[in-house]
């Protein structure tokens, strides 16, 4: 009889221990889940999709008095160089004949009150100003014809050779520290000009012995003095002669080899 009582007591204690352990385990698991809901670990850095690359040293302006370091350009570098040249050409201002911009006509309406009339006048003035700015920007962008002469890969044009060949072709060093081809003498109007492809785009005649560059840009503003078509033909012949003298290549505005098809496209632009 005592054995059965002892057995029931032990069984009851064992059951109580199991129940207590189960309750304790459940609370511990619940506490662990809630404690991990918010992680204190710092967020990982996002992966950037941007590709960064150092700008080649040959494309950075080093100043006209210092010799530019030699560096072999890749196609991407060359395109970036052309963009810098185009920006430089746009910044070179040559006196041209300007045409008066016609303003659009507006229908007169009877305003209901003086305040409405004032507001309409302000809107019309702002519209005219915006249209004038857009027209001037478009005219400036499309009225510059450019050709490039670039050196072969791994080669640079030397300063003395550049000056000698440009002077033989009738260029004169002048305004903006670049070379110009004039209608007659240096006092006559400019037909077209040539600048350095590398920033800042100018030449220093006092340091031409130390000067070198990967290319030059020839450009002509339209309308030009006299006959635009004749001036463009002269510019094309001059550029091709210069390229042949210095051993370079002629490229068009799309940075492609200037061929017969490119020549016809250039002439059609002026003829139209």
Swiss-Prot record:
GO terms for biological process: division septum assembly; FtsZ-dependent cytokinesis. Pfam families: ZipA_C. InterPro entries: Cell_div_ZipA, ZipA_FtsZ-bd_C, ZipA_FtsZ-bd_C_sf. It is found in: Cell inner membrane. Residues 26-272 are cytoplasmic. The keyword Transmembrane applies. It comes from the Bacteria. It is a single-pass type I membrane protein. Keywords: Cell cycle, Cell division, Cell inner membrane, Cell membrane, Membrane, Transmembrane, Transmembrane helix. HAMAP family: ZipA. Belongs to the ZipA family. Essential cell division protein that stabilizes the FtsZ protofilaments by cross-linking them and that serves as a cytoplasmic membrane anchor for the Z ring. Also required for the recruitment to the septal ring of downstream cell division proteins. Interacts with FtsZ via their C-terminal domains. This is Cell division protein ZipA. The gene is zipA.
